[in-house]
Amino acid sequence: MNKRNDDRILRQISRRRPRRQSSLAPIWVLLGIVAVFLAALLIILLPRGSGNSNISDGTSYVTTDSEGNTAPPDSGGPGEKYPGYKAISLSRDEVHRGDLILVNSDYEYVFPEDADIVGISENKTSDYKVAYDNLRLDARILGIFNDMLAEFSSVMNRRDVIVNSGYRDYKEQQDIYQSRKELYGEAYADAYVQDPGYSEHHTGYALDMSVYTDDGVSMTFDKDPDFTWFYHASHTYGFIRRYADHKEDITGIPNEEWHFRYVGKPHAYYMYSNDLCLEEYIALLRSYPFDGEHLEFRDDSEQLWEMYFIPASDSGATEVYIPTEGEYTLSGNNVDGFIVAAEKKAQ
């Protein structure tokens, strides 16, 4: 090949158009960017679990609002049906749990597997005494009780309250019933001791207390005016005097000066202010369904409350509506439904 031919070939090569790059390359780059964006968006939007799937104990079945506190699983966005409320799903078993459960001769207590029961002696303050070292109570309720006794001892300058009974398991209640029956007869045992499984003491929310002075004098609260403080102030801590003489035909229990039960502050206030026993209050709340008029009132701190009832489904889960904002409590009634108590802003 001579030089002329070489020059000609070189000129032809230099005139050739460069190979066109594939038109698919920019598309693949664009698709890659879109995929990365969608993956990041999916991570952001995926719901994160709260660690609690129901109204189980630990917060006394108190669930709070959107400020980071625990709430049961959401089964519907806020405002889908009722503006200002959102739906959660509760199982039928949840009816048997909460501060307002009614336990009496008609409604048996369902023992939970995760009850937080603690010894009173190991967790009490110096403001009161205990009759026996093995007495127990629900841990959360004991903390509230300690606060109440601290105020009482500060106001009255008395430390003569003695706790005589607290939480009882099934066997303990069985033993007490049998003991009272042998000592005082079956009629007495039937009147003052509930059958095993039907006692409020199973809840860990109830306790019996009286007066026991340093001089060894024992008496009930009604015998000393100082101790009637509990009749008129315990509701500010969420406790009620459970069995009053004039309610015996409803509760089925004769007057008990010593028996107090925790139900929660707003409920205790309303029951105290309107002279209602727990049976009456549970019945009253059924007349305030969620989709109807709600019960509204102000407590002694001028906080406005709304209460409403949602019947439990006979089968499967129940859709319960709770406020999307503000604090609220949620409880089963151990009978047929759920009760919501919500703090409400004044209009």
Q: What does each of the following model-derived ranges do?
A:
Residues N2-G166, Y170-Q347:
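Extracytoplasmic cell-surface/polysaccharide-interacting catalytic and binding patches
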